[in-house]
Design a protein with these regions (language model features):
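Solvent-exposed loop/turn segments at secondary-structure junctions
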Residues: 7-8, 20-22, 70-73, 92-96, ...
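Cysteine-nucleophile protease catalytic domains, especially the papain-like/related folds used
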Residues: 1-85, 159-162
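Envelope-exposed proteins and targeting segments
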Residues: 84, 116-118, 128
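Noncatalytic regulatory segments and standalone regulatory/sensor domains
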Residues: 100-114, 123-162
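Short regulatory "switch" loops immediately downstream of catalytic or recognition motifs
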Residues: 56-57, 91-103
Length: 162
């Protein structure tokens, strides 16, 4: 329901500007493409915050979504230890991130994506592993070291509900 009714979507709308750079829709604020097909590309934290806040407000929840991009893995583990799951930007199967492609937004920010970019929820950890709730694979356990490497490669992007 959250994706179908609350997630802001847009096409990439790519074009070359007079400066010769490729421009397109801000994927931080919109899911690019259709989230229900393989043609859907990706979205950033802004789109998830918008969707979550809309859903939470409509269900009467006092919770709100917050973009905490830039948080260290230790900060994520602290939140999980306190019972707060964290939406994290990672890759499918926690594989190394593939080569990225991207474009500039109208405000000049560069946004990129890779064919194995993915979002999931960090729900647990040990000294050597992390537990992820993955919308594709279900509950998965990965090497903590690999998670931290992949999380960093995705710009330490993350969202929490408070």
């Amino acid at each position: 329901v959250m994706a179908s009714e609350y997630l802001p979507t847009a096409s990439a709308n790519r074009y070359y500007g007079a400066d010769g750079r490729l421009y397109g829709t801000d994927m931080n604020e919109y899911f690019i493409g259709d989230p229900f097909t393989e043609g859907g590309i990706i979205c950033g934290t802004g789109a998830i915050v918008t969707a979550a806040d809309g859903y939470l407000a409509d269900t009467g929840s006092a919770l709100r979504a917050y973009d905490i991009t830039g948080s260290s893995p230790e900060e994520l583990y602290r939140r999980v230890r306190n019972g707060q799951p964290v939406v994290v930007w990672v890759t499918i199967s926690m594989a190394d991130r593939r080569a990225a492609q991207g474009w500039y937004t109208e405000n000049g920010d560069y946004v990129d994506w890779s064919t194995n970019d993915h979002g999931a929820v960090l729900i647990g950890y040990t000294d050597t592993t992390v537990t992820i709730a993955d919308p594709i694979s279900g509950r998965m356990e990965y090497s903590r070291e690999q998670f931290e490497k992949v999380f960093s490669s995705r710009g330490n992007r993350c969202v929490v509900l408070e």
